[in-house]
Amino acid sequence: MRAMIMSFASYNLWQPWQKTSPLLAELFTDFEPGIHISQVQMQSGVTGINLPRIYSVFKQSLDQDPTAEWTKKIIPQLENVETDLIHNAELRDLYFEQIVDPKLSAKKARDTIWAMRKNKDFKKIAREVYLKHGSRRRQQFNRASN
């Protein structure tokens, strides 16, 4: 859920992770800055190391909340809306006007991100990021016996 929210904010709404990260962090009961920031950056696609993850909010809602029980609990205005309508976002007349078309905005983000990744310097820059910040196995040092 966290990954999808960050992905949607970054790709579909094209918001900078630095602004959305603190808003999301406020909702966590298990907030750990060292984990949160790196995950936010990864889900926002700014590291260049990981493949972009642009989630389908429709697929995620169907997979994670097939009966829409959680969605209806979080958004009480949807309590009497049919589950099928909730999962395909046909809510314009029932709840609110969409601020972005999820399918079109995901396609635009995907096209934009992949165009950037095709840049001739992308791999070089991504490698530099990895060498500076990427996770690596720690070397095992043999302890001298006393």
Task: Briefly describe each language-model feature range.
Residues 1-146:
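C-terminal catalytic domain of photolyase/cryptochrome flavoproteins
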